[in-house]
Amino acid sequence: MDLISVLPSASKSCVCLHKPLSSSTHKLKPFCRKIRILGMPRPRKSVLMVSSMSISVNTLVSDDAVQRRTGGYHSNLWNDDVIQFLSTPYGELAYRERAERLIDEVRNIFSSMSLEDGESSDLIQRLWMVDNVERLGIDRHFKNEIKSALDYVYSYWSQKGIGCGTKSIITDLNSTALGFRILRLHGYPVSAEVFKHFRNQIGQFVSCHSETEEDIRSIVNLYRASLIAFPGEKVMEEAEIFSEKYLKETLQKIPDCSLSREIGDVLEHGWHTNLPRFEARNYMDVFGQDTKNMESNRKAEKLLELAKLEFNIFQSIQKTELESLLRWWNDSGSPQITFTRHRHVEYYTLASCIAFEPQHSGFRLGFAKACHIITVLDDMYDLFGTVEELKLFTAAIKRWDPSATDCLPQYMKGIYMMVYNTVNEMSAEAQKAQRRDTLNYARQAWEVYLDSYMQEAKWIATGYLPTFEEYLENGKVSSGHRVSALQPMLTMDIPFPPHILKEVDFPSNLNDLACAILRLRGDTRCYQEDRARGEETSCISCYMKDNPGATEEDALNHLNVMISGVIKELNWELLKPDSSVPISSKKINFDITRAFHYGYKYRDGYSVSSVETKSLVMRTLLEPVPL
């Protein structure tokens, strides 16, 4: 593969414009025409200002007066030495054998619960087990046991909820809220109307006067349940408002303990920005500090030991995968692309936090590679490339042939081959998993994606500000969500026949909503930095254009309301009962949305990856859990 030079060739070049794969209805014959490429010898001066909290804007001026913008992004935080010198003993056989014994012991705990049927707490005990194996990240070992436990709980579910046990005379909020959340997440048809029975005579949720740990925990579970609301569930909105306020006030009153840590984590990360492996790492600390659990409950000890072992064993797998990713990154010539962000380790970490089953190596590596390519293309189309060069590149991608590089500036040749080779390689991996060729399908997705970039590049070049609707429709494609998810998803051991794929990928509501969240949330976090780089077009600026007199604050408030509504719609698309598509088939696309949403929680965590994103890498990838 050609190494990449960021400096375009000064020679003339041509472009061969062929019929794109995605435009099958066009009858135009292929033709070639020569287009003059503005050369760019090595720039005289480059000024780089790096800040961990801000983005600087640089302009490179070539000898022939071509100006190219760069983002002034901070450099790669994870050099070769950091990756190559990672070491962990947890890949040894003894640790895996210990984990297997613990898995059997936990299965026995699940089995023993059937002997306690009819006991005063048989329902809450089952929910406790399911909730904790999921939060600790070890639920993949107990799918059958979880289903059996939830079938049992659901058989006693009523319009007023449930109590602690099957013989409970009255229902209670803690059991009902925890049960509602878990049952809904597993596709059981439970109605939010059940929470109306826990409001006072004037229809308001009321706090408990005693405020015991059990009372507080009930509100924690009510808050967790409220986050998986469907559109139109007014009672869930009220529950969220009440429980969030209650828990924030409670944090000011109670001492620092495992419960306060749990409340803080739940309020901080919720569900839509909480990544399963990251949640597991945080919950291990909470779970292990809960003296009530650890002193009187042998079950808790087994769960915690297994969770820690599994976490550390997976880090030995991550080390091997990171070495593979690093080889790809170097072989692709990526280190020589100096105008872009290098966040391949961060993207791999996100993938590892949502799909940490050992067999999903193809997904983790594919996601990291796809996201790196997307980042390079994003920076090339938004900042570095001229409009004429970008037209050449877009046309070359639609040819899908290495000879298309003959028509490209020198700095684009290696980028083209990185896209070409990686997409082909991921298609080969997908063919093994899905037993059919998906290359043409993937090519169509990449073509549409680059067309959306081309549209934005034209807007930037001409200073055109589109309407909000026009911008959002294009922006959902240019967000990159679809191309980041599609091929990595197809490498998994989850069947995606065509009728399922169309309900998960384009043109499904699930895909549309996921792309919308990424575009809307991304713009609320990036618009100021983008504007400083000369990119005026964003959801904020387009909304203000459509609504004369509206301020940035008005626009942000409107977008946040939109995001809240889209999240509820996304919940419905994932969890709606009686769907023809299993939740397991939709979950990975949904979790990718959570991963991107996490990256934009506080800032643009991909441009500025030296704060929260760096902490995520350290906590889930580099640092083992003390046993």
UniProtKB/Swiss-Prot annotation:
<dbReference type="Pfam" id="PF03936">
    <property type="entry name" value="Terpene_synth_C"/>
</dbReference>
<dbReference type="GO" id="GO:0050550">
    <property type="term" value="F:pinene synthase activity"/>
</dbReference>
<keyword id="KW-0456">Lyase</keyword>
<keyword id="KW-0460">Magnesium</keyword>
<dbReference type="GO" id="GO:0018867">
    <property type="term" value="P:alpha-pinene metabolic process"/>
</dbReference>
<feature type="short sequence motif" description="DDXXD motif">
    <location>
        <begin position="378"/>
        <end position="382"/>
    </location>
</feature>
<comment type="pathway">
    <text>Terpene metabolism; oleoresin biosynthesis.</text>
</comment>
<comment type="pathway">
    <text>Secondary metabolite biosynthesis; terpenoid biosynthesis.</text>
</comment>
<dbReference type="GO" id="GO:0000287">
    <property type="term" value="F:magnesium ion binding"/>
</dbReference>
<dbReference type="GO" id="GO:0016114">
    <property type="term" value="P:terpenoid biosynthetic process"/>
</dbReference>
<feature type="binding site">
    <location>
        <position position="378"/>
    </location>
    <ligand>
        <name>Mg(2+) 1</name>
    </ligand>
</feature>
<keyword id="KW-0479">Metal-binding</keyword>
<feature type="binding site">
    <location>
        <position position="378"/>
    </location>
    <ligand>
        <name>Mg(2+) 2</name>
    </ligand>
</feature>
<feature type="binding site">
    <location>
        <position position="382"/>
    </location>
    <ligand>
        <name>Mg(2+) 2</name>
    </ligand>
</feature>
<dbReference type="InterPro" id="IPR005630">
    <property type="entry name" value="Terpene_synthase_metal-bd"/>
</dbReference>
<feature type="binding site">
    <location>
        <position position="530"/>
    </location>
    <ligand>
        <name>Mg(2+) 3</name>
    </ligand>
</feature>
<feature type="binding site">
    <location>
        <position position="382"/>
    </location>
    <ligand>
        <name>Mg(2+) 1</name>
    </ligand>
</feature>
<dbReference type="InterPro" id="IPR001906">
    <property type="entry name" value="Terpene_synth_N"/>
</dbReference>
<comment type="similarity">
    <text>Belongs to the terpene synthase family. Tpsd subfamily.</text>
</comment>
<dbReference type="GO" id="GO:0016102">
    <property type="term" value="P:diterpenoid biosynthetic process"/>
</dbReference>
<dbReference type="GO" id="GO:0009507">
    <property type="term" value="C:chloroplast"/>
</dbReference>
<protein>
    <recommendedName>
        <fullName>(-)-beta-pinene synthase 2, chloroplastic</fullName>
        <ecNumber>4.2.3.120</ecNumber>
        <ecNumber>4.2.3.119</ecNumber>
    </recommendedName>
</protein>
<dbReference type="InterPro" id="IPR034741">
    <property type="entry name" value="Terpene_cyclase-like_1_C"/>
</dbReference>
<dbReference type="Pfam" id="PF01397">
    <property type="entry name" value="Terpene_synth"/>
</dbReference>
<dbReference type="InterPro" id="IPR050148">
    <property type="entry name" value="Terpene_synthase-like"/>
</dbReference>
<dbReference type="GO" id="GO:0010333">
    <property type="term" value="F:terpene synthase activity"/>
</dbReference>
<dbReference type="InterPro" id="IPR008949">
    <property type="entry name" value="Isoprenoid_synthase_dom_sf"/>
</dbReference>
<keyword id="KW-0150">Chloroplast</keyword>
<keyword id="KW-0934">Plastid</keyword>
<comment type="function">
    <text>Monoterpene synthase (TPS) involved in the biosynthesis of monoterpene natural products included in conifer oleoresin secretions and volatile emissions; these compounds contribute to biotic and abiotic stress defense against herbivores and pathogens. Catalyzes the conversion of (2E)-geranyl diphosphate (GPP) to (-)-beta-pinene and, to a lower extent, to (-)-alpha-pinene.</text>
</comment>
<feature type="transit peptide" description="Chloroplast">
    <location>
        <begin position="1"/>
        <end position="51"/>
    </location>
</feature>
<dbReference type="InterPro" id="IPR036965">
    <property type="entry name" value="Terpene_synth_N_sf"/>
</dbReference>
<keyword id="KW-0809">Transit peptide</keyword>
<dbReference type="InterPro" id="IPR044814">
    <property type="entry name" value="Terpene_cyclase_plant_C1"/>
</dbReference>
<dbReference type="GO" id="GO:0010597">
    <property type="term" value="P:green leaf volatile biosynthetic process"/>
</dbReference>
<dbReference type="InterPro" id="IPR008930">
    <property type="entry name" value="Terpenoid_cyclase/PrenylTrfase"/>
</dbReference>
